[in-house]
Amino acid sequence: MDKSKQPFRKSKRSFRRRLPPIGSGDQINYRNMSLISRFISEQGKILSRRVNRLTLKQQRLITIAIKQARILSLLPFLNNEKQFERAESIPRTTGPRTRNK
C-alpha cells in the first residue's frame, strides 16, 4: 500500500523535552525572590503544577515558600494594579428606563 493511501498515519516528529524550571542548584527558599516570582501570576496567584512543569515535591516547597514570603510581607497577597485601561463609556441612544406598572 502506498504511503499516500494512509491518511490517518501520524508523521514522526522530533520531540524535544523542555528543561525543568528549577535547576538542581536552586534552593527553594522564601528569601529567593527571583525564583519564587517565576511561579506567581500577574494577579499574585500561585500557578498550578501543570503550568509550572514542577514535580509534586517542588510544587509543595514553592507553595510553602510563597506563603512564608507573603506572611513576612516580602510578597503581596494580591496584586491589585490595573493592567488595562478602561474604554470610554458609550452613551445610551434610548431614553431613561421607565417602570411598567
UniProtKB/Swiss-Prot annotation:
Coiled-coil regions listed: none
The keyword Aminoacyl-tRNA synthetase is assigned to this record: no
Source organism superkingdom: Eukaryota
Gene3D superfamilies, per the entry: Ribosomal protein S18
GO MF annotation terms: small ribosomal subunit rRNA binding; structural constituent of ribosome
Record's compositionally biased regions (Basic residues): 1-19
Cellular component, GO, one term: mitochondrial small ribosomal subunit
Subcellular location: Plastid, Chloroplast
Keywords: Chloroplast, Plastid, Ribonucleoprotein, Ribosomal protein, RNA-binding, rRNA-binding
InterPro entries assigned to the protein according to its UniProt record, in alphabetical order: Ribosomal_bS18, Ribosomal_bS18_CS, Ribosomal_bS18_sf
Region (Disordered): 1-26
Protein's UniProt keywords contain Nucleotidyltransferase: no
GO biological process, one term: translation
NCBIfam families: S18
HAMAP family linked to this entry: Ribosomal_bS18
Subunit structure: Part of the 30S ribosomal subunit.
Family assignment from sequence similarity: Belongs to the bacterial ribosomal protein bS18 family.
PANTHER family in the record: 30S RIBOSOMAL PROTEIN S18, SMALL RIBOSOMAL SUBUNIT PROTEIN BS18M
Protein name per the record: Small ribosomal subunit protein bS18c
Provenance organism: Dioscorea elephantipes
Highest classification ranks of the organism: Eukaryota, Viridiplantae, Streptophyta, Embryophyta, Tracheophyta
